[in-house]
Amino acid sequence: MDFDAVLLLSFGGPEGPEQVRPFLENVTRGRGVPPERLDHVAEHYLHFGGVSPINGINRALIEQLRAAQALPVYFGNRNWEPYVEDTVKVMRDNGIRRAAVFTTSAWSGYSSCTQYVEDIARARAAAGPGAPELVKLRPYFDHPLFVEMFAGAIADAAAKVPAGARLVFTAHSVPVAADERVGPRLYSRQVAYAARLVAAAAGYAEHDLVWQSRSGPPQVRWLEPDVADHLRALAESGTPAVIVCPIGFVADHIEVVWDLDEELRAQAESAGMLMARASTPNAQPRFARLAADLIDELRCGRTPARVTGPDPVPGCLASVNGAPCRPPHCAAQATG
């Protein structure tokens, strides 16, 4: 399968105070989120001048992608400029025929995979006749470079705290019902599997997996335990130090720089615990090489590169033009 471009498809984020509320309204449209909740989340962005780190990180990643492979790279977002619909129209006008789509999510599941598939279908429909074929690359939670980057980040974080610090992996929580509809529990099982792979690569026999950044009505069950509750339990048990690895995030989203670096760190300090946060891949050259490797898997017909461990968890393969992924692991969520 030949390609003549790469599309980096991401979530998007505000780049100024005046963009924060419109961005959050885009993210939550149709979900019935009360205005006061939006006001609360807006304060997190305003703490950083109304600028999310994600777009700047993605632009730096694009430069790394251009260095890692020869195809032109385009950039589109779901929730903010540059919108993917606009980007695909530019690709059409530039004569792009088929592009590999690399998303800033390593996982299967609705918000992690299927929603990006829907973004692709919507963008192609908006572009109309002549829209390029868009091939979404597979989730990469078990790719050797994904495991290597996080294992190295844990080693760097471990140098900042005493030996014996507890290793805690975090990922974005989702409603339990949504997780059970796909796989079942495909997202949470993939995260747990990746955490096991990374912990083993980093030399840890034990680790914890917790969830963060839940939202929505309190009566709706989300994946647990929550990271704040878990940190409290560790402190009460006398754990002196913790390494927090946000394995669910490939870049420093606001959920990382606020929820972990600000709120969780303050909680750790008040409990007398030392905390070191492992870095995310962000715009590392290895992350760009990972994307280039996924492209070559399709272009050259190579067997997907995967780290294998006990009880491996399946993942989707490619999705073309907004069709369900192959195998259809995420189709249950897509069809309700």
From Swiss-Prot:
The reply to whether Cytoplasm figures as a keyword in the UniProt entry is yes
Instruction: Check the record and name the Pfam families matching this protein.
Output: Ferrochelatase
PROSITE patterns membership: FERROCHELATASE
**Localization, UniProt:** Cytoplasm
UniProt-listed InterPro entries: Ferrochelatase, Ferrochelatase_AS, Ferrochelatase_C, Ferrochelatase_N
Q: What general EC class does the enzyme of this chain belong to?
A: lyase
Q: Which family does it belong to?
A: Belongs to the ferrochelatase family.
Purpose: Involved in coproporphyrin-dependent heme b biosynthesis. Catalyzes the insertion of ferrous iron into coproporphyrin III to form Fe-coproporphyrin III.
Give the matching NCBIfam families: hemH, PRK00035.2-1
What protein am I looking at? Coproporphyrin III ferrochelatase
**Which species does the entry assign this protein to?**
Mycobacterium avium (strain 104)
